[in-house]
């Protein structure tokens, strides 16, 4: 790390960083640490003044244990940080400070723990890159460390290493731990048994504590040149730049540092089991407490410190630059450095006191009713903090002061000042308010300043709201697991980036500005869901519009127009409920422009059907006026956990009980739906169970109210999480209601899993498209169509749980929508350029296009340039597959052309390639064939795109589409192969094996280009001849959290079992394997171009199996034809480059013999005497 900053040194030679001077003086090998480095629960002596010329306030030493780089005070404070405004030169200086702090100040244990915490914050691609860099750096010292690595990972017993007081024993244990493999559990178990018992270490410390004076003399003798060897043998002496005062007695500073390093490495090593690491972390905390404050603190596990967790294992550093519950902004963190541990903040607060409080200013944001007061607090340790308090907080604090801290004059002054703050905005006298408060705090007594109440009010981190960030590395891992289990989100790397910080925005009914509370998360996941309440007029406000941002808290935006829209919606609550329908429609038009975040639908108590309405069920989805990101690309990466919305309206419970009989009265119910999650949902449709609602229309023939004001719902147990909510139900086939045209509506694309029946969809005015599959379809025509994407066939388990019925009849409604007002460049055309009024029913297997860039659509525009998609989805007319039903009173308005796009698995493979247009015949609602229905199929090579209802682009690629014969298809043209292989937009392949009318499976058609099992894309690194519908797990096309279940049956192979390309495979046989669904959109797999190497072969590895069940494929047998990977092709020597053996078996001389690193073992002990029994190699 120091090597990285060397080019930056000559840039600013005259400005050495202020932090670097004193830590260098403190951390220089052999230096004596000052007494302020010792920190325990008792107040330490005051710190000594700085040695050099004064540069303003004493800059705080860097935080211990590597949990936060130092930030200079004064003018350079935060200059290189975001918002610091210091320019590039200031950023370079801050970078140099971090390098020097890391390399010169921290010891080995602190560096390792700090680096492990940083690695937990990296995403998978960054980790892979860092792994490559580490491999290159570690290769230089491989030959020197090879023997020690073999001993550490070998099967032989390393021998007796029980006496931790011997430097050679500690050295050998540290070397073994450093060279232990990450998966060698057996060797890790042996090392775990060899680690010193912490009780023995503590007992040794307690036994030698009474001989502290003699130990101190030995310490000083160990720092002399003559006593170096004696101190080395005794375990004393300087080490690692961290020298502690001799509180341990018998163990010197070097021995203490080595023991800390030993337990730190063991507690972080991945080869140890979880239980072992937790136990070792407890031992490490006990050891730190003993070295800090004596054995009596270690026996009670630091409980006198009252650190925010109940156990000492939770005693890890907080971020020293964190906002507290009152939005306190810490300019400097007044925490002295400790080389061994982190002192609790309670000890810090007891050790320092407030010397001066100054009111910096009074300000008001937006249309707030109250002021905010900013105070500058000077502490006794020369640190300065800036604390911002609201009027209510300041009023509560001042009125609750004890009598000994106030007087009659003080009380009168307080009341006068607070009355100014509570007046209306136009009646306030701001010039009078600020001087009163400034004089009040500047003339306060020492008893007032040193009071515990004043101290806790102005402290940097509140004891009430402080959630300890304990054990940074393990806490991050715990949070990752919890986020995966709660939300099953595919953005696992995003969840790790800002898991330390939750931004909770709390808006109140009175229009008070949002209070942003950045608090530390705790080890318990429930502590992060901090709820805040405010009482106004006796009514508890439960409106917690909180968005817990995991990745980008800065995207949590509350715009002014949404704020005003919320005020309008709230004002409509207090009006009379019996207002006309048209007036409510106007209110909805103003309030319906929602930009919500989607997550799972949390449904509560069971519902009771009363005619056409439902009563007393709360669909906990809440209002969406606060957005997290204005675009789908911003908000889809910010998942949120579902929350119970206990929102209360201003109505009484009796009024709510009476409000059960009319659908039109439900529009006044403020219990709106809350979405948290991914797309920008502006078009909202609701879902109801299909068996409990007789009709969705009211007496006027209209649909139900907008779902934002709709009645409540019950939990739908069999349905996976939807990204939109639809009014659903077993609607009678004769009830068909056309939807009104919105003002600026756009085409809607929806995911409808099979167990859901679509009966009616209501749109509201001023609504923008549903962000379901990314940008929705925009074709630029005057009338747009609604596409219901639903499948009567078994669909992949991404969309359907096991207990659902895959074949379900759907009722299809035709909607005409006005033209869009946005640019078609940012829209995805699901089935492009259809005639006006056309209606499409497609399977998710044929119409899903994953959007990797929701803002704009890269690559070829749609699947129309994809010959593979058209070969798998046949286009048939509805007059051949939908029987005419007599006696239907209500039908869909006659469309110009109606088509159904179904996978070829549901069609016959031997029908003539003809198209069947449906010229405006009535379509019965809810009649679609099931899986084994006898239907006709047409080839997608039909040259009549107008009559078949498909676009021009679909009909212009006949060479790439298979014919009606079940034989292999002709190879596509090179241009088409290139376009389909390189396009990311059409990576959803629906090539399936055909199924005839009797249900027998026809052999699948061979295709020239399709999804590859090696890389997941359509490439040339392997054949995909026997591609089948359910043989491949595609990435989730929707970025939201869906409940993923394993496949219905075991899956065959889709690619040969090696990276050899087509030229190296003789007969096309393949090795079956199971490819589980990866949690990321594109798994990190090997580069497919490696398949061009003749001797390269690698068996396809199983995917990410940490959170998903992995089932092995049956009949996994190796190829006997010789086309599979050769045995000698799996291993290669990186030393000589020849295949067939590993590097450790290589007979050639090393290629890097002349470039070996100069690193030598740091902890190698001195040469033992001749009569010593230790191995000379150690």
UniProtKB/Swiss-Prot annotation:
Compositional bias segments (type: Gly residues): 75-88
One GO location term (cellular component): cytoplasm
Pfam families named among the record's database cross-references: Vts1, zf-CCHC
Presence of keyword Hydrolase: no
Compositionally biased tracts (Polar residues): 595-607, 665-683, 974-986
Keyword annotations: Metal-binding, Phosphoprotein, Zinc, Zinc-finger
Annotated region described as Disordered, given as residue ranges: 1-90, 207-249, 557-683, 936-986
Comp. bias (Pro residues): 43-67, 959-973
Listed PANTHER family: ZINC FINGER CCHC DOMAIN-CONTAINING PROTEIN 2
Protein name: Zinc finger CCHC domain-containing protein 2
Organism per entry: Homo sapiens
Lineage of the organism: Eukaryota, Metazoa, Chordata, Craniata, Vertebrata
Gene: ZCCHC2
């Amino acid at each position: 790390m120091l090597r990285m900053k060397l080019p930056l040194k000559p840039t600013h030679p005259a400005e050495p960083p202020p932090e670097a001077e004193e830590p260098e003086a403190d951390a220089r090998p052999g230096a004596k640490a000052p007494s302020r480095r010792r920190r325990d629960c008792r107040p330490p002596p005051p710190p000594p003044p700085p040695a050099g010329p004064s540069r303003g306030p004493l800059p705080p030493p860097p935080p211990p244990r590597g949990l936060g780089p130092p930030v200079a005070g004064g003018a350079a404070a935060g200059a290189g940080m975001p918002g610091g405004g210091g320019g590039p030169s200031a950023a370079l200086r801050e970078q140099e400070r971090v390098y020097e702090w890391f390399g010169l100040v921290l010891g080995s244990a602190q560096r390792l723990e700090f680096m492990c915490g940083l690695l937990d914050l990296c995403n998978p691609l960054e980790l892979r890159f860092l792994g490559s860099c580490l491999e290159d750096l570690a290769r230089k010292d491989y030959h020197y460390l090879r023997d020690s690595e073999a001993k550490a990972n070998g099967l032989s017993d390393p021998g007796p290493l029980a006496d931790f007081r011997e430097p050679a024993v500690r050295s050998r244990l540290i070397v073994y731990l450093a060279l232990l493999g990450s998966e060698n559990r057996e060797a890790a178990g042996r090392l775990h048994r060899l680690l010193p018992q912490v009780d023995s270490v503590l007992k040794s410390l307690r036994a030698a504590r009474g001989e502290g004076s003699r130990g101190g003399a030995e310490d000083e003798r160990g720092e002399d040149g003559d006593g170096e060897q004696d101190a080395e043998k005794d375990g004393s002496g300087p080490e690692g730049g961290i020298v502690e005062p001799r509180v341990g007695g018998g163990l010197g500073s070097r021995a203490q540092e080595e023991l800390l390093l030993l337990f730190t490495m063991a507690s972080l090593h991945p080869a140890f089991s979880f239980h072992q690491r937790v136990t070792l972390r407890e031992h490490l905390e006990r050891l730190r407490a003993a070295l800090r404050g004596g054995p009596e603190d270690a026996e009670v596990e630091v409980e006198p410190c009252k650190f925010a967790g109940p156990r000492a294992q939770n005693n890890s550093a907080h971020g020293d630059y964190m906002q507290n519950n009152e939005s306190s902004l810490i300019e400097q963190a007044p925490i002295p450095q400790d080389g061994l541990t982190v002192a609790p903040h309670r000890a810090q607060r007891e050790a320092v006191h407030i010397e001066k409080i100054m009111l910096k200013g009074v300000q008001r944001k937006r249309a707030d009713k109250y002021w905010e007061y900013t105070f500058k607090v000077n502490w006794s340790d020369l640190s300065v903090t800036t604390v911002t308090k609201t009027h209510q907080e300041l009023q509560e604090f001042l009125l609750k002061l004890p009598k000994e801290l106030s007087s009659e004059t003080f009380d009168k002054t307080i009341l006068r000042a607070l009355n100014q703050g509570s007046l209306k905005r136009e009646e306030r006298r701001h010039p009078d308010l600020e001087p009163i408060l400034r004089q009040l705090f500047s003339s306060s007594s020492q008893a007032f300043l040193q009071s515990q109440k004043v101290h806790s009010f102005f402290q940097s981190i509140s004891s009430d709201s402080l959630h300890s960030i304990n054990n940074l590395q393990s806490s991050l891992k715990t949070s990752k697991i919890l986020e995966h289990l709660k939300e099953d989100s595919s953005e696992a790397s995003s969840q790790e980036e800002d898991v330390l910080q939750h931004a909770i925005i709390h808006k109140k009914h009175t229009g008070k500005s949002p209070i942003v509370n950045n608090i530390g998360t705790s080890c318990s996941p429930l502590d992060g869901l901090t709820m805040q309440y405010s009482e106004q007029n006796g009514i508890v406000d439960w409106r917690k519009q909180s968005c817990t941002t995991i990745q980008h808290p800065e995207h949590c935006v509350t715009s002014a127009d949404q704020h005003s829209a919320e005020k309008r919606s709230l004002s409509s609550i207090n009006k009379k409920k019996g207002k006309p329908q048209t007036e409510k429609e106007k209110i909805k038009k103003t309030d319906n422009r929602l930009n919500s975040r989607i997550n799972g639908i949390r449904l509560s108590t069971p519902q009771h059907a009363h005619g056409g309405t439902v009563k007393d069920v709360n669909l906990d989805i809440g209002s969406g006026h606060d957005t997290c990101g204005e675009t789908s690309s911003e908000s889809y990466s910010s998942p949120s956990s579902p929350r119970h919305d206990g929102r209360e309206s201003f109505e009484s419970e009796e009024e709510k009980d009476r409000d059960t009989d009319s659908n039109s009265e439900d529009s006044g119910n403020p219990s709106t739906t809350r979405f948290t999650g991914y797309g920008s949902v502006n078009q909202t449709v609701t879902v109801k169970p299909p068996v409990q609602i007789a009709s969705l229309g009211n007496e006027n023939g209209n649909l139900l109210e907008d779902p934002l004001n709709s009645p409540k719902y019950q939990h739908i147990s069999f349905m996976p999480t939807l990204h939109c909510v639809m009014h659903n139900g077993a609607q009678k086939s004769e009830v068909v209601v056309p939807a009104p045209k919105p003002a600026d509506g756009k085409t809607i694309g929806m995911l409808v899993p099979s167990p859901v029946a679509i009966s009616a969809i209501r749109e509201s005015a001023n609504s923008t498209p549903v962000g379901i599959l990314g940008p929705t379809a925009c074709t630029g025509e005057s009338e747009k169509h609604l596409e219901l994407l639903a499948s009567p066939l078994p669909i992949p388990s991404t969309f359907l749980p096991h207990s659902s019925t895959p074949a379900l009849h759907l009722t299809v409604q035709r909607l005409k929508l006005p033209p869009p007002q946005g640019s078609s460049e940012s829209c995805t055309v699901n089935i492009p350029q259809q005639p006006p009024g056309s209606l499409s029913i497609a399977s998710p297997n044929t119409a899903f296009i994953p959007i990797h860039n929701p803002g704009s659509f890269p690559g070829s525009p749609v699947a129309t340039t994809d010959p593979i998609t058209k070969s798998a989805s046949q286009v048939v007319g509805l007059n051949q597959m939908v029987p005419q039903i007599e006696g239907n009173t209500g039908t869909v308005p006659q469309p110009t052309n109606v088509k159904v796009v179904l996978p070829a698995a549901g069609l016959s493979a031997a029908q003539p390639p003809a198209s069947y247009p449906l010229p405006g015949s009535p379509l019965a609602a809810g009649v679609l064939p099931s899986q084994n229905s006898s239907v006709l199929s047409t080839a997608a090579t039909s040259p009549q795109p107008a009559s078949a209802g498909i676009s021009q682009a679909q009909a212009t690629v006949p060479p790439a589409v298979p014919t009606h014969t079940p034989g292999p298809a002709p190879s596509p043209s090179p241009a088409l192969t290139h376009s389909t292989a390189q396009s990311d937009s059409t990576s959803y392949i629906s090539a399936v094996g055909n199924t005839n009318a009797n249900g027998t499976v026809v052999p699948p058609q061979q295709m020239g280009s399709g999804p590859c099992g090696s890389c997941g894309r359509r490439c040339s690194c392997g054949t995909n001849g026997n591609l089948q519908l359910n043989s491949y797990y595609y990435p989730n096309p929707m970025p939201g959290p869906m409940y993923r279940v394993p496949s219905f049956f075991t899956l065959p192979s889709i690619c040969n079992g090696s990276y050899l390309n087509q030229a190296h495979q003789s007969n096309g046989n393949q090795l079956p394997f199971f490819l589980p669904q990866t949690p990321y959109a594109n798994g990190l797999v090997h580069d497919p171009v490696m398949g061009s190497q003749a001797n390269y072969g690698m068996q396809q590895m199983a995917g990410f199996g940490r959170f998903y069940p992995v089932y092995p494929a049956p009949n996994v047998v190796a190829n006997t034809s010789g086309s599979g990977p050769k045995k000698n092709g799996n291993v290669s020597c990186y030393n000589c480059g020849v295949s067939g053996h590993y590097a450790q078996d290589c007979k050639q001389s090393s290629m890097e013999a002349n470039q070996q690193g100069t690193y030598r073992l740091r902890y190698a002990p001195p040469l033992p005497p001749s009569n010593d029994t230790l191995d000379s190699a150690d």
